[in-house]
UniProtKB/Swiss-Prot annotation:
Reported function: Involved in transcription antitermination. Required for transcription of ribosomal RNA (rRNA) genes. Binds specifically to the boxA antiterminator sequence of the ribosomal RNA (rrn) operons.
Name of the protein this chain belongs to: Transcription antitermination protein NusB
A GO CC term attached to the entry: cytosol
Gene Ontology molecular function terms on file: RNA binding
């Protein structure tokens, strides 16, 4: 599976975990078997879970007149994934992480999601 597809699947898993009180393995079981064992997909999901408090703090310090809890689950999940890539995955250039996050926002969010995600990420990397 290519990284773009893995990001989409990781988003879906993390989104489910964010909106439902569900266990990780229960959500992972909903994926096809080959997807379940994709190394990049699992590294995104497990990385966001492991570093969630640090990632959320990073996001929170760059929000104006917002709290992380007020951000819609779609945008919050996408931001968490992008920040994980920027902070913890060295072989992905920042601009790739940002572009992929914007693409995810266009795919899964509304028409303003891409602008919001881009704005927050631009502040974080500045």
């Amino acid at each position: 599976m290519n990284r773009h597809k893995a990001r989409e699947k990781a988003f879906q898993v993390l989104f489910q975990l964010d909106i439902n009180e569900t266990e990780l393995e229960e959500v992972m079981e909903t994926l096809k078997e080959k997807e379940r064992y994709d190394v990049f997909l699992r590294s995104l999901v497990e990385g966001v879970i492991q570093h969630k408090s640090v990632i959320d703090e990073k996001i929170s310090t760059h929000l104006e007149k917002w709290t992380i809890d007020r951000i819609a689950s779609v945008e919050r999940t996408i931001l968490r994934m992008a920040i994980l890539e920027i902070m913890y995955i060295d072989d992905i250039p920042q601009n790739v992480s940002i572009n992929e996050a914007i693409e995810l926002a266009h795919t899964f969010g509304d028409e303003q999601s891409g602008k919001f995600v881009n704005g927050v990420l631009s502040k974080i990397i500045a």
